[in-house]
Amino acid sequence: MRALDNGEVCIFVGGTGNPFFTTDSCAALRALETSCDVILMAKNGVDGVYTADPKTDKSAKLIKTITYHEILDKKLKVMDATAAGLLEDSNIQIRVFEMKPENFLKVITGDSMGTLITK
């Protein structure tokens, strides 16, 4: 936690080591513990949240902004419900984007690529 206290950017990866806790729940817990403003969620092969699975539905459309409530209501498979509930209650946003090396720098410098999930 010294790095956070010094204003450094910290990247958390992995799980909690507890059964029944997904990596989504782990990310939500770490975000709460460290008073994060936003979670950066890099996805493999998809560049944000879509109205349907873009790999199987050609009519799927990228959603630029969506709420946690809408994700749960529409049963979009972005994250597990426990993590979504924790983050919604805490007003922590998520930026979902495609996991490419060049995208990390773009996102942390303010690029609005992908999807923003808000309260």
Regions found by a protein language model. Give the residues of each.
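C-terminal catalytic "cap/lid" subdomain
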Residues: M1-K119
